[in-house]
Amino acid sequence: MFGIRRTLALWLLASHVSAWTTYTVRHSDGQDDTPALAAALATGNYSSNATILFAKGTKYNIFTPIKFPVLNNVEVRIEGNLSYPDDIATIQKIVGTSGFPGAWFTFTGGNNVTLRGSQDPEWGWVDSHGQAWWDAVQQTNRPHGWAFSKITNGVIRDMKLWKPIGWNFATSGSKNVHIFNNKIVAVSSTKSFPFNTDGFSAGGTDLVFENNHVQNGDDCLTVGSGAKNIVFKNSYCEGGHGLSIGSLGSGGSVADVQDVLIENVVMKDSLYAARFKSWTGGNGLARNITWKNIAFDNVMFPIYVTQNYWDQDDGPRPNSSSVNNTHIQDFLFENFVGTINDKPGYVEGSCVSDPCWYAVDGATGKEVAILDLYPNTATNVLVKHVLATTETGSLVRVMCNSSTITSDVGFKCWDGLFIPTKAGLL
Protein backbone atom coordinates (compact mmCIF):
# COMPACT_ATOMS: atom_id res chain seq x y z
CA MET A 1 0.00 0.00 0.00
CA PHE A 2 2.84 2.38 0.91
CA GLY A 3 4.45 1.80 -2.48
CA ILE A 4 1.21 2.60 -4.29
CA ARG A 5 0.78 5.84 -2.33
CA ARG A 6 4.38 6.84 -3.01
CA THR A 7 3.99 6.16 -6.72
CA LEU A 8 0.76 8.16 -6.80
CA ALA A 9 2.40 11.09 -5.00
CA LEU A 10 5.32 11.10 -7.44
CA TRP A 11 2.92 10.97 -10.37
CA LEU A 12 0.94 13.92 -9.02
CA LEU A 13 4.16 15.88 -8.46
CA ALA A 14 5.37 15.11 -11.96
CA SER A 15 2.01 16.13 -13.37
CA HIS A 16 2.19 19.44 -11.54
CA VAL A 17 5.72 20.13 -12.73
CA SER A 18 4.95 19.21 -16.31
CA ALA A 19 1.86 21.45 -16.24
CA TRP A 20 4.06 24.54 -15.89
CA THR A 21 5.35 25.76 -19.23
CA THR A 22 7.92 28.34 -20.26
CA TYR A 23 7.78 30.29 -23.48
CA THR A 24 10.95 32.12 -24.47
CA VAL A 25 10.04 35.04 -26.70
CA ARG A 26 11.65 34.67 -30.11
CA HIS A 27 13.84 37.46 -31.47
CA SER A 28 14.60 38.37 -35.08
CA ASP A 29 17.33 40.91 -35.75
CA GLY A 30 15.92 44.16 -37.08
CA GLN A 31 12.34 42.91 -36.93
CA ASP A 32 9.41 43.50 -34.63
CA ASP A 33 9.34 40.81 -31.94
CA THR A 34 5.77 41.50 -30.83
CA PRO A 35 4.03 39.35 -33.51
CA ALA A 36 5.83 36.18 -32.41
CA LEU A 37 4.72 36.73 -28.82
CA ALA A 38 1.18 37.60 -29.92
CA ALA A 39 0.99 34.37 -31.92
CA ALA A 40 2.16 32.35 -28.93
CA LEU A 41 -0.38 34.02 -26.66
CA ALA A 42 -3.14 33.35 -29.18
CA THR A 43 -2.65 29.60 -28.80
CA GLY A 44 -3.84 29.81 -25.21
CA ASN A 45 -0.95 27.62 -24.09
CA TYR A 46 0.65 30.34 -21.99
CA SER A 47 -2.34 32.01 -20.36
CA SER A 48 -2.07 29.90 -17.22
CA ASN A 49 0.67 28.15 -15.26
CA ALA A 50 3.38 29.61 -17.43
CA THR A 51 6.46 31.79 -17.61
CA ILE A 52 6.82 34.18 -20.53
CA LEU A 53 10.53 34.91 -20.76
CA PHE A 54 12.42 37.68 -22.49
CA ALA A 55 15.84 36.05 -22.35
CA LYS A 56 18.97 37.62 -20.91
CA GLY A 57 21.52 38.59 -23.54
CA THR A 58 18.86 39.43 -26.12
CA LYS A 59 17.81 42.92 -27.19
CA TYR A 60 14.17 42.68 -28.18
CA ASN A 61 12.39 45.01 -30.60
CA ILE A 62 8.95 45.85 -29.24
CA PHE A 63 7.94 47.88 -32.25
CA THR A 64 4.20 47.39 -31.73
CA PRO A 65 2.17 47.20 -28.50
CA ILE A 66 1.81 44.01 -26.48
CA LYS A 67 -1.62 43.13 -25.10
CA PHE A 68 -1.79 40.14 -22.80
CA PRO A 69 -4.97 38.08 -22.46
CA VAL A 70 -6.45 37.35 -19.05
CA LEU A 71 -3.73 35.44 -17.19
CA ASN A 72 -3.83 32.93 -14.34
CA ASN A 73 -0.65 31.94 -12.48
CA VAL A 74 1.68 33.57 -15.01
CA GLU A 75 5.03 35.29 -14.66
CA VAL A 76 6.24 37.68 -17.34
CA ARG A 77 9.98 37.79 -16.80
CA ILE A 78 12.08 40.45 -18.52
CA GLU A 79 15.72 39.43 -18.36
CA GLY A 80 16.65 40.82 -21.77
CA ASN A 81 16.52 44.45 -22.88
CA LEU A 82 13.42 45.78 -24.63
CA SER A 83 13.29 48.70 -27.04
CA TYR A 84 10.44 50.81 -28.40
CA PRO A 85 10.73 52.21 -31.95
CA ASP A 86 13.09 55.18 -31.93
CA ASP A 87 11.02 57.03 -34.54
CA ILE A 88 8.40 59.39 -33.11
CA ALA A 89 6.10 59.31 -36.15
CA THR A 90 5.94 55.51 -36.09
CA ILE A 91 4.66 55.46 -32.52
CA GLN A 92 2.27 58.37 -33.10
CA LYS A 93 0.67 56.53 -36.01
CA ILE A 94 0.09 53.45 -33.85
CA VAL A 95 -1.26 55.42 -30.90
CA GLY A 96 -3.58 57.33 -33.20
CA THR A 97 -5.38 54.20 -34.40
CA SER A 98 -8.72 53.17 -32.93
CA GLY A 99 -7.33 49.80 -31.86
CA PHE A 100 -4.54 51.13 -29.65
CA PRO A 101 -5.15 49.75 -26.13
CA GLY A 102 -3.85 52.86 -24.36
CA ALA A 103 -0.49 51.54 -23.21
CA TRP A 104 2.46 49.94 -24.97
CA PHE A 105 2.21 46.99 -22.56
CA THR A 106 -1.29 46.08 -21.42
CA PHE A 107 -2.39 43.45 -18.92
CA THR A 108 -6.14 42.99 -19.27
CA GLY A 109 -6.81 41.01 -16.10
CA GLY A 110 -6.13 37.84 -14.20
CA ASN A 111 -5.07 36.24 -10.94
CA ASN A 112 -1.60 35.58 -9.54
CA VAL A 113 0.26 37.55 -12.18
CA THR A 114 3.88 38.67 -11.81
CA LEU A 115 5.73 41.20 -13.94
CA ARG A 116 9.38 40.72 -13.09
CA GLY A 117 12.47 42.46 -14.35
CA SER A 118 16.11 41.68 -13.63
CA GLN A 119 18.47 42.62 -10.83
CA ASP A 120 21.38 42.53 -13.29
CA PRO A 121 22.37 46.20 -13.77
CA GLU A 122 23.03 45.68 -17.49
CA TRP A 123 19.93 43.70 -18.39
CA GLY A 124 16.19 43.97 -17.96
CA TRP A 125 15.97 47.57 -19.19
CA VAL A 126 13.04 48.91 -21.21
CA ASP A 127 14.17 51.80 -23.42
CA SER A 128 11.40 54.04 -24.77
CA HIS A 129 13.73 56.61 -26.40
CA GLY A 130 11.88 59.40 -24.64
CA GLN A 131 14.69 61.93 -25.07
CA ALA A 132 13.74 62.57 -28.69
CA TRP A 133 10.16 63.29 -27.64
CA TRP A 134 11.25 65.68 -24.91
CA ASP A 135 13.65 67.52 -27.22
CA ALA A 136 10.93 67.93 -29.83
CA VAL A 137 8.41 68.98 -27.14
CA GLN A 138 6.19 66.43 -28.83
CA GLN A 139 3.07 65.69 -26.81
CA THR A 140 0.72 64.37 -29.48
CA ASN A 141 -0.26 60.68 -29.45
CA ARG A 142 2.08 59.63 -26.68
CA PRO A 143 1.64 56.11 -25.30
CA HIS A 144 1.37 55.21 -21.66
CA GLY A 145 3.87 52.59 -20.58
CA TRP A 146 2.47 49.72 -18.50
CA ALA A 147 -1.21 49.11 -17.74
CA PHE A 148 -1.35 46.43 -15.04
CA SER A 149 -5.13 46.40 -15.02
CA LYS A 150 -7.75 44.25 -13.28
CA ILE A 151 -5.15 41.98 -11.71
CA THR A 152 -5.89 40.23 -8.42
CA ASN A 153 -2.88 39.05 -6.42
CA GLY A 154 -0.17 40.62 -8.54
CA VAL A 155 3.49 41.56 -8.31
CA ILE A 156 5.55 44.16 -10.18
CA ARG A 157 9.19 43.88 -9.19
CA ASP A 158 12.73 44.64 -10.36
CA MET A 159 11.56 46.54 -13.45
CA LYS A 160 13.87 49.18 -14.96
CA LEU A 161 12.54 51.84 -17.34
CA TRP A 162 14.91 54.10 -19.27
CA LYS A 163 13.72 57.45 -20.63
CA PRO A 164 10.02 56.64 -20.88
CA ILE A 165 8.02 58.79 -23.27
CA GLY A 166 5.37 59.51 -20.66
CA TRP A 167 3.29 57.85 -17.97
CA ASN A 168 4.79 54.65 -16.58
CA PHE A 169 2.96 52.15 -14.33
CA ALA A 170 -0.80 52.15 -13.73
CA THR A 171 -2.78 49.63 -11.67
CA SER A 172 -6.36 50.54 -12.54
CA GLY A 173 -8.90 48.13 -11.10
CA SER A 174 -6.31 45.84 -9.53
CA LYS A 175 -6.42 44.32 -6.05
CA ASN A 176 -3.74 43.04 -3.70
CA VAL A 177 -0.67 44.01 -5.72
CA HIS A 178 2.89 44.37 -4.41
CA ILE A 179 5.07 46.80 -6.39
CA PHE A 180 8.69 46.89 -5.26
CA ASN A 181 12.34 47.32 -6.25
CA ASN A 182 11.48 49.13 -9.49
CA LYS A 183 13.52 51.88 -11.12
CA ILE A 184 12.28 54.65 -13.41
CA VAL A 185 14.87 56.95 -14.99
CA ALA A 186 13.20 59.79 -16.91
CA VAL A 187 16.12 62.21 -16.74
CA SER A 188 16.79 64.51 -19.67
CA SER A 189 20.36 64.81 -20.95
CA THR A 190 19.53 68.23 -22.45
CA LYS A 191 17.59 71.27 -21.22
CA SER A 192 14.37 69.66 -22.44
CA PHE A 193 11.84 68.69 -19.79
CA PRO A 194 10.38 65.15 -19.44
CA PHE A 195 6.72 66.14 -19.28
CA ASN A 196 4.09 63.75 -17.89
CA THR A 197 6.54 61.02 -16.93
CA ASP A 198 4.45 60.02 -13.90
CA GLY A 199 5.97 57.15 -11.94
CA PHE A 200 3.15 55.14 -10.39
CA SER A 201 -0.56 55.70 -10.83
CA ALA A 202 -2.27 53.87 -7.98
CA GLY A 203 -5.75 52.75 -8.90
CA GLY A 204 -7.47 49.85 -7.19
CA THR A 205 -7.37 48.49 -3.66
CA ASP A 206 -4.85 46.93 -1.29
CA LEU A 207 -1.71 48.08 -3.09
CA VAL A 208 1.75 48.20 -1.52
CA PHE A 209 4.57 50.18 -3.18
CA GLU A 210 8.00 49.96 -1.56
CA ASN A 211 11.70 50.34 -2.27
CA ASN A 212 11.12 52.08 -5.59
CA HIS A 213 13.42 54.64 -7.23
CA VAL A 214 11.90 57.34 -9.44
CA GLN A 215 13.58 60.18 -11.32
CA ASN A 216 11.05 61.95 -13.49
CA GLY A 217 9.20 65.11 -14.45
CA ASP A 218 5.77 64.60 -12.94
CA ASP A 219 4.14 62.88 -9.97
CA CYS A 220 6.27 60.22 -8.35
CA LEU A 221 3.04 58.73 -7.08
CA THR A 222 -0.50 59.69 -7.95
CA VAL A 223 -3.47 58.14 -6.19
CA GLY A 224 -6.66 58.33 -8.21
CA SER A 225 -10.34 58.13 -7.45
CA GLY A 226 -11.55 54.73 -6.29
CA ALA A 227 -8.25 53.87 -4.63
CA LYS A 228 -8.44 52.33 -1.16
CA ASN A 229 -5.86 50.88 1.21
CA ILE A 230 -2.74 52.20 -0.52
CA VAL A 231 0.75 52.08 1.03
CA PHE A 232 3.78 53.80 -0.52
CA LYS A 233 6.97 53.57 1.54
CA ASN A 234 10.75 53.36 1.73
CA SER A 235 11.32 54.99 -1.65
CA TYR A 236 13.24 57.76 -3.44
CA CYS A 237 11.73 60.40 -5.71
CA GLU A 238 13.71 63.02 -7.61
CA GLY A 239 12.88 65.84 -9.98
CA GLY A 240 9.14 65.44 -10.19
CA HIS A 241 5.89 66.73 -8.76
CA GLY A 242 5.59 64.85 -5.54
CA LEU A 243 3.52 62.30 -3.70
CA SER A 244 0.08 63.26 -4.90
CA ILE A 245 -3.52 62.45 -4.16
CA GLY A 246 -5.52 63.38 -7.24
CA SER A 247 -6.31 65.27 -9.18
CA LEU A 248 -9.87 64.54 -8.08
CA GLY A 249 -13.27 65.83 -9.15
CA SER A 250 -12.46 66.90 -12.69
CA GLY A 251 -15.57 67.92 -14.60
CA GLY A 252 -17.72 67.63 -11.49
CA SER A 253 -17.03 63.92 -11.05
CA VAL A 254 -17.50 62.20 -7.69
CA ALA A 255 -14.21 61.28 -6.03
CA ASP A 256 -13.59 58.52 -3.51
CA VAL A 257 -10.13 57.93 -2.01
CA GLN A 258 -9.66 56.32 1.38
CA ASP A 259 -6.94 54.96 3.64
CA VAL A 260 -3.62 55.99 2.13
CA LEU A 261 -0.29 55.81 3.97
CA ILE A 262 2.83 57.39 2.46
CA GLU A 263 5.91 57.09 4.66
CA ASN A 264 9.70 57.02 4.71
CA VAL A 265 10.27 58.74 1.38
CA VAL A 266 13.09 61.01 0.21
CA MET A 267 12.01 63.86 -2.08
CA LYS A 268 14.85 65.63 -3.92
CA ASP A 269 14.80 68.56 -6.36
CA SER A 270 11.03 68.34 -6.65
CA LEU A 271 8.28 70.87 -7.18
CA TYR A 272 6.20 69.34 -4.40
CA ALA A 273 6.80 66.79 -1.67
CA ALA A 274 3.28 66.00 -0.39
CA ARG A 275 0.37 67.22 -2.46
CA PHE A 276 -3.40 66.97 -2.61
CA LYS A 277 -5.19 68.37 -5.64
CA SER A 278 -8.88 68.54 -6.47
CA TRP A 279 -10.78 70.59 -9.00
CA THR A 280 -13.26 73.33 -8.23
CA GLY A 281 -16.73 71.93 -8.88
CA GLY A 282 -15.81 68.38 -7.94
CA ASN A 283 -17.68 66.12 -5.56
CA GLY A 284 -16.96 63.27 -3.19
CA LEU A 285 -14.52 62.63 -0.36
CA ALA A 286 -10.84 61.93 0.28
CA ARG A 287 -10.41 60.49 3.77
CA ASN A 288 -7.71 59.14 6.07
CA ILE A 289 -4.60 60.20 4.15
CA THR A 290 -1.21 60.25 5.89
CA TRP A 291 2.19 61.49 4.72
CA LYS A 292 4.78 60.56 7.34
CA ASN A 293 8.57 60.69 7.67
CA ILE A 294 9.29 62.71 4.54
CA ALA A 295 12.80 64.05 3.96
CA PHE A 296 12.87 66.80 1.34
CA ASP A 297 15.81 68.54 -0.30
CA ASN A 298 15.49 71.56 -2.61
CA VAL A 299 11.69 71.34 -2.82
CA MET A 300 9.57 74.37 -3.73
CA PHE A 301 6.31 73.36 -2.00
CA PRO A 302 6.89 70.72 0.70
CA ILE A 303 3.23 70.50 1.81
CA TYR A 304 0.58 71.68 -0.61
CA VAL A 305 -3.16 71.15 -0.42
CA THR A 306 -5.44 72.75 -3.00
CA GLN A 307 -9.10 72.38 -3.86
CA ASN A 308 -8.58 74.75 -6.77
CA TYR A 309 -6.44 72.64 -9.11
CA TRP A 310 -5.97 73.64 -12.72
CA ASP A 311 -4.18 72.01 -15.67
CA GLN A 312 -2.20 74.41 -17.85
CA ASP A 313 -2.93 72.24 -20.89
CA ASP A 314 -6.57 73.37 -20.64
CA GLY A 315 -5.73 77.03 -21.13
CA PRO A 316 -6.18 79.97 -18.73
CA ARG A 317 -7.50 79.24 -15.24
CA PRO A 318 -11.29 79.63 -15.36
CA ASN A 319 -13.34 81.77 -13.01
CA SER A 320 -15.69 79.35 -11.28
CA SER A 321 -18.68 80.15 -9.11
CA SER A 322 -19.31 76.49 -8.26
CA VAL A 323 -20.15 75.74 -4.64
CA ASN A 324 -19.17 72.08 -4.95
CA ASN A 325 -15.78 70.78 -3.90
CA THR A 326 -14.24 67.44 -3.05
CA HIS A 327 -14.29 67.22 0.74
CA ILE A 328 -11.21 66.17 2.68
CA GLN A 329 -11.12 64.53 6.08
CA ASP A 330 -8.40 63.25 8.42
CA PHE A 331 -5.26 64.44 6.62
CA LEU A 332 -1.99 64.08 8.55
CA PHE A 333 1.42 65.46 7.56
CA GLU A 334 3.93 64.25 10.16
CA ASN A 335 7.71 64.38 10.50
CA PHE A 336 8.74 66.54 7.54
CA VAL A 337 12.39 67.59 7.51
CA GLY A 338 14.29 69.42 4.79
CA THR A 339 15.09 72.49 2.72
CA ILE A 340 12.80 74.75 0.69
CA ASN A 341 13.95 75.94 -2.71
CA ASP A 342 13.38 79.70 -2.49
CA LYS A 343 16.14 80.72 -4.89
CA PRO A 344 15.20 84.05 -6.53
CA GLY A 345 14.19 83.71 -10.17
CA TYR A 346 14.07 79.92 -10.16
CA VAL A 347 11.57 78.46 -12.65
CA GLU A 348 10.70 74.76 -12.56
CA GLY A 349 11.04 72.94 -15.88
CA SER A 350 7.35 72.21 -16.44
CA CYS A 351 6.49 75.91 -16.50
CA VAL A 352 5.40 77.01 -19.99
CA SER A 353 3.17 79.94 -19.05
CA ASP A 354 3.44 83.32 -17.35
CA PRO A 355 2.61 83.13 -14.55
CA CYS A 356 3.59 79.50 -14.14
CA TRP A 357 0.80 76.99 -13.71
CA TYR A 358 1.98 76.29 -10.17
CA ALA A 359 2.09 79.95 -9.08
CA VAL A 360 0.15 80.75 -5.91
CA ASP A 361 -1.15 84.28 -5.46
CA GLY A 362 0.58 85.91 -2.52
CA ALA A 363 3.15 83.16 -2.01
CA THR A 364 6.73 84.18 -1.27
CA GLY A 365 8.37 80.87 -2.18
CA LYS A 366 9.34 80.32 1.45
CA GLU A 367 6.22 78.42 2.52
CA VAL A 368 6.62 74.98 4.07
CA ALA A 369 2.86 74.46 3.97
CA ILE A 370 0.07 75.92 1.84
CA LEU A 371 -3.53 75.01 2.64
CA ASP A 372 -5.70 76.33 -0.18
CA LEU A 373 -9.11 75.27 1.11
CA TYR A 374 -12.76 76.14 0.58
CA PRO A 375 -14.98 76.85 3.61
CA ASN A 376 -16.79 73.91 5.20
CA THR A 377 -15.01 71.29 3.10
CA ALA A 378 -12.02 70.25 5.24
CA THR A 379 -12.08 68.40 8.57
CA ASN A 380 -9.16 67.42 10.80
CA VAL A 381 -6.17 68.51 8.72
CA LEU A 382 -3.01 68.41 10.84
CA VAL A 383 0.64 69.29 10.17
CA LYS A 384 3.00 68.23 12.96
CA HIS A 385 6.70 67.83 13.69
CA VAL A 386 8.01 69.94 10.80
CA LEU A 387 11.61 71.13 10.63
CA ALA A 388 12.35 73.21 7.55
CA THR A 389 14.85 75.79 6.38
CA THR A 390 15.07 77.88 3.24
CA GLU A 391 18.07 77.81 0.94
CA THR A 392 18.45 81.59 1.20
CA GLY A 393 18.32 81.54 4.98
CA SER A 394 15.01 83.41 5.11
CA LEU A 395 12.43 82.57 7.73
CA VAL A 396 9.99 79.81 6.85
CA ARG A 397 6.39 80.81 6.20
CA VAL A 398 2.95 79.28 5.66
CA MET A 399 -0.28 80.15 3.86
CA CYS A 400 -3.61 79.29 5.46
CA ASN A 401 -7.01 81.01 5.69
CA SER A 402 -8.49 80.54 9.16
CA SER A 403 -12.00 81.13 7.82
CA THR A 404 -11.83 77.88 5.84
CA ILE A 405 -11.06 75.49 8.69
CA THR A 406 -11.93 75.66 12.37
CA SER A 407 -9.65 72.98 13.82
CA ASP A 408 -6.01 73.43 14.85
CA VAL A 409 -3.89 72.62 11.78
CA GLY A 410 -0.66 72.38 13.77
CA PHE A 411 0.54 75.91 13.07
CA LYS A 412 -0.86 79.41 13.22
CA CYS A 413 -3.29 79.53 10.31
CA TRP A 414 -2.41 82.72 8.49
CA ASP A 415 -0.29 84.06 5.67
CA GLY A 416 2.84 84.61 7.67
CA LEU A 417 5.70 83.03 9.56
CA PHE A 418 5.55 79.34 10.42
CA ILE A 419 4.59 79.22 14.09
CA PRO A 420 3.81 75.70 15.37
CA THR A 421 0.89 75.32 17.75
CA LYS A 422 0.51 72.78 20.52
CA ALA A 423 -1.10 70.29 18.13
CA GLY A 424 1.88 70.64 15.80
CA LEU A 425 4.37 69.86 18.55
CA LEU A 426 2.72 66.98 20.40
Predicted features and spans:
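Extracellular/periplasmic carbohydrate-active domains that bind, remodel
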Residues: 2-426
